[in-house]
Amino acid sequence: MSFEQQLKKGVLEMLVLELLAKKSMYGYEMIQTLKAASEDFFVLKEGTLYPILYRLEDNDFAKSSWSEPKDGQAPKKYYEITKKGRERLLFQKEHWTLFEKKVDELLRGNGK
């Protein structure tokens, strides 16, 4: 796995929770939203996203429900963040901010 892939993998759960904190979404919608918002930097495949979503559900950070079929379209599975998921997201964002700060300090030679 490349350095870039390792970095991306480390933040995907946080990014998915951030999307769900804004609104309930189905999988393909998350993939497209993340791709557009990151200007094609985060391009996920379903095989990457769905294990994250399943893990979020298993840990009660997200829950899912099926939409009603519309105009002959198949129902979609929507995911939404839970209260526990919002707490997890806040925790991750706080640690991400500290992590980013410390890495930046070290790279600039300002570390102790």
Protein language model features and the residues they cover:
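Short beta-strand/turn micro-motifs at beta-sheet edges
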Residues: S2-Q5, W66-E68
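Short, contiguous hydrophobic alpha-helices characteristic of membrane insertion segments
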Residues: E4-Q6, D60, G111-K112
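N-terminal helix-turn-helix DNA-binding core of bacterial DNA-binding proteins
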Residues: Q5-T48
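Basic amphipathic alpha-helical segments that dock to polyanions
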Residues: L49-L56
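Beta-hairpin "wing" of winged helix-turn-helix
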Residues: E57-P75, E80
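Accessory beta->alpha helical hairpin/"wing" motif in late/C-terminal subdomains of nucleic-acid enzymes
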Residues: I81-G85
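Amphipathic alpha-helical dimerization/coiled-coil segments
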Residues: R86-K112
